[in-house]
Every structure is written in structure tokens, then in C-alpha cells.
Amino acid sequence: MTTPAIRSQVPLLHVADVARTIRFYDRLGFVVANSVTANDGTLQWVWLVAGSTSLMFARTEEPVVPGAQRALLYLYADDVAAMHAHLRAHGVDVGPIQTPFYSPRGEFRFADPDGWGLIVAHT
């Protein structure tokens, strides 16, 4: 018997406010591909896409503690310096561009409003 193929993987992260998350990830070029809204009008879930990258976010009733999140999203961009400048211009607290041995063209780190860590590196 052969194992059925898995086509892709999409991270699903819990957040306190889906609408706030959409606004934040818009700064990175993500757009809404799909969403679910509760009867009261509150966004409960969203699927965001940017190029071939997909992320899903779902509202949680549990406390979301910034800085305590355990996942790290590694995003690839064509121009790290331009993305760094763009995010700073939009009020995102980004770390400095660094050039570790595994990313000689540079990368930088920051966090989203719920504390999920992100790294942007060159493609």
C-alpha cells in the first residue's frame, strides 16, 4: 500500500484579534484568500497568501501572550533591505539586518502583535 501524498503545508496560528492580524500581515504583502466570520461579525479565521506562501490564523479565547509563542515563520523576499525599510516606515519594530553564515545576503527578525516570531531573508 502506498502512502497518500501530502500536497502542501500551511501553518495555523492562534491570535487574539484576526482583523488586527490581517492589517499587520498586509504590510508584508499578504492578502485575504478566505475568511470565516461569526454571526456577531467577528472574524474567526483567515487564510492569507503572498506569492506561493500561505498562512492561516484563527481567533482563540485562550490568552495570547506576546513573546511566549513557540513558532517562528521564515519568510523569503527578493529584497531584504527594501522589506526592512518598508516595515519600519509602517511602524513595525524590526530588528537589524544581520548576515549569519547561513544567510549571507541578510535577514532580520521581528514579531507580530501576538508575539509570533518572523524572519525575513533573501530568496
Task: Give, region by region, the residue ranges found by the protein language model.
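Core segments of cupin and vicinal oxygen chelate
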Residues: 5-6, 12-54
